[in-house]
């Protein structure tokens, strides 16, 4: 038992495993979300640019005009 935390080595390893699992889940969800966002609307600009008016749904375009 560690005097500073009061946890055993096994408890510390269990907490570490849960933290790593949470981090991997967070990174995986972020990677998937960014891939979907890129598939929907690429981050790079083409020759004509990447104007909202060219890609927005009709209800957004009507609100802009």
From Swiss-Prot:
Topology of this chain in the membrane: Single-pass type II membrane protein
Lineage: Bacteria, Pseudomonadati, Pseudomonadota, Gammaproteobacteria, Chromatiales
GO biological process, one term: photosynthesis, light reaction
Cell membrane among keywords: yes
Protein name per Swiss-Prot or TrEMBL: Light-harvesting protein B800/830/1020 beta-2 chain
Periplasmic membrane side: 41-65
MF GO annotations: bacteriochlorophyll binding; electron transporter, transferring electrons within the cyclic electron transport pathway of photosynthesis activity; metal ion binding
UniProt superkingdom: Bacteria
UniProt KW keywords: Antenna complex, Bacteriochlorophyll, Cell inner membrane, Cell membrane, Chlorophyll, Chromophore, Light-harvesting polypeptide, Magnesium, Membrane, Metal-binding, Transmembrane, Transmembrane helix
Organism field: Halorhodospira halochloris (Ectothiorhodospira halochloris)
